[in-house]
A protein has these predicted regions:
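Alpha-helical scaffold domains
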Residues: 1-109
């Protein structure tokens, strides 16, 4: 579904990949390939798919220490959601902030 001509299928694919990591399962062995694909295509994608790709990169950065800096750099390089206003108590979508906040939350547990 990652290469589907349908936006909804692409968005679903990326959301599912992020969700696999978010729910605490052992990350699949496709993380390197996913991250490379995100880096290569996120800026050309539809906004709905960009969000889901960003979501996946965020959770990779939170849970996979070896990819954390790479995910943060991706956020800095693309600037996606950097200027997005976020309500108090909500986590921003901007990758550097998202990863820092979500990672720190899990360190307190």
């Amino acid at each position: 579904w990652a290469n589907s001509p349908f936006v909804l299928q692409r968005r679903t694919f990326w959301y599912y990949q992020g969700r696999l990591r978010w729910i605490g399962k052992t990350p699949p062995e496709n993380t390197e390939d996913l991250l490379s694909l995100i880096e290569a295509t996120i800026t050309q994608e539809q906004a709905e798919v960009q969000w889901a790709m960003n979501f996946t990169a965020g959770w990779i950065g939170v849970f996979d220490e070896q990819y954390r800096d790479r995910c943060i750099e991706l956020g800095k390089r693309t600037g996606l959601y950097k200027d997005e206003k976020v309500s108090k108590g909500c986590t921003p979508n901007y990758l550097p902030d998202f990863i820092r906040i979500e990672y720190n939350k899990r360190q307190k547990d």
